[in-house]
Amino acid sequence: MRHMQSVTRATSICGSGVKQVIGKGHPHARVVGARKARIPEREELSVKPKMVRNTHLNLQPQERQAFYRLLENEQIQEFLSMDSCLRISDKYLIAMVLAYFKRAGLYTSEYTTMNFFVALYLANDMEEDEEDYKYEIFPWALGDSWRELFPQFLRLRDDFWAKMNYRAVVSRRCCDEVMSKDPTHWAWLRDRPIHHSGAMRGYLRNEDDFSPRGPGLTPASCTLCHKAGVCDSGGVSHNNSSSPEQEIFHYTNREWSQELLMLSPELLLDPECTHDLHILQEPLVGLEPDGTALEWHHL
């Protein structure tokens, strides 16, 4: 009995000694058999192969022909002719509509005017900096009651977007692929004029240009297109005069230089003379501290 007590006591002392030794060991010592904590996220990323996204649409001939028949719809034809400046329906935006139809998996029987306007609105959402021009789509898609119905239209847009798995970004290469199938079709000749590229500063806008007009009304007059001699949706000039004042506006997108400064006919300069261009900086404050007017300064 005494022997058993001594053995038990010795075992407990030995065990406590082992614990003390382990507890006081080197702080960086690794216990035998211990494994490093696994990081599942890193392991999954290292094992998962790189995904190469295929941008090829693989459009079938019957899909292209169904889309071209849709473009010949009377309502869509009137809408496209209304967009004389090609701000909301140039060739790239129309190509995006066809790409959206393919990504959404629409049957050719679903190539309808409503789906066209929904997809075109989404394309403008994705690509255009000017947000207000696309509102012209509302009265064409919804009719006279568009102010009450446009929230439902926006829900249709969201549903269409979800049907594409939210893949609304279409590269220029993809658009060029769509247009390359039938490069002579009239829809792919709708080049937007160079003077309508980019965004416009807010204080230069005419608010009347942004109010939706809808069917039955003539498009708003565009000063830039009038100066450039562009009068139809194809961007072709109907002005046959060859005055120097008008010839400066007859550049195509490929011929236009980013360093070219476009002036109105009233400001044309003599090409045989040398001119110095001075840019004036507008003063931030109207008066000096003593009450005298500030002068403009050359930059």
From Swiss-Prot:
Region Speedy/Ringo box, residue ranges: 61-193
Chief localisation class: nucleus
Pfam family, one: Spy1
Keyword Cell cycle applies: yes
UniProt cross-references to InterPro entries, sorted A to Z: Speedy, Speedy-Ringo_regulator
PANTHER family tied to this protein: SEEDY PROTEIN A/C FAMILY MEMBER (PTHR31545), SPEEDY PROTEIN C (PTHR31545:SF2)
Family classification: Belongs to the Speedy/Ringo family.
Name the record gives this protein: Speedy protein 1-A
Gene source species: Xenopus laevis
